[in-house]
Amino acid sequence: MKIDIMTLFPEMINAVMRESIIGRAQDKGIVEVKATNIRDYALDKHHKADDAPYGGGRGQVMLAEPLYLCHEALSGGEHVHTVFLSAQGAPFNQEKARELLAKEHFILVCGHYEGIDQRFIDECVD
């Protein structure tokens, strides 16, 4: 099983993954977990991954472009089951865990700020 995690804080994710049950599972070759920095796919020189929401509103929203490019790199252009981790979504439970366990590869998208660009959610999230 391969789990890719799209995040702005890969070092934090990797630290937890090395020191947990998942770390032992990785050592045994049961699962491969990789955290990828979304900023690495920003096209500007400052690696900007956020901006004010289109149409106004408060806060910052993660930009669609670096999200798309990161997702494309991780999925290799193939459909890979993608989950956006958000407080607005359905609660994670044992049934959802079993569904993910059946996947050979899936991508977890960690949001930040006020959220992420809805266009990315509509296009890439299952």
Give the location of each predicted region.
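Hydrophobic/aromatic beta-strand patches that form the interior of the parallel beta-sheet core
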Residues: 4-6, 34-36, 81-83, 106-107, ...
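Generic recognition of short, well-ordered alpha-helical segments
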Residues: 16-20, 95, 119
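S-adenosyl-L-methionine/SAH cofactor-binding core of RNA-modifying enzymes
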Residues: 61-112, 117-118
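N-terminal nucleotide/polyanion-binding subdomain common to many enzyme families
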Residues: 1-74
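Short, solvent-exposed amphipathic alpha-helical segments in soluble enzyme
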Residues: 20-24, 98-102, 123-124
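Structured adenosyl-cofactor binding patch, chiefly the S-adenosyl-L-methionine
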Residues: 116, 120-126
